[in-house]
């Protein structure tokens, strides 16, 4: 259980969404259309450390990546400022 808690501590759902969106050459407006949210709402989600599973699933489908990718991808400590 302690290992799981440590892993969760290094996961940032919003940054995972942002990183994936950028890798796919998509802007927030384009993603907002796919998830049926406003661009400011997408921006807000990209800043959230924890996002509920239902919303994370919507982003995963829109970005065409597995749900677990967004849910469990750990931050690269070198890239965190």
What do these predicted regions represent?
Residues 29, 40, 68:
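Key DNA-contact positions within bacterial/archaeal DNA-binding proteins
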């Amino acid at each position: 259980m302690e290992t799981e808690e440590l892993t969760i501590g290094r996961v940032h759902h919003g940054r995972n969404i942002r990183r994936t969106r950028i890798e796919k050459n998509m802007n927030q407006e384009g993603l907002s259309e796919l998830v049926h949210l406003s661009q400011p709402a997408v921006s807000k989600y990209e800043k959230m450390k924890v996002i509920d599973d239902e919303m994370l699933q919507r982003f995963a489908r829109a970005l065409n990546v597995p749900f677990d990718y967004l849910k469990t991808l750990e931050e690269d400590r070198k890239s965190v400022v």
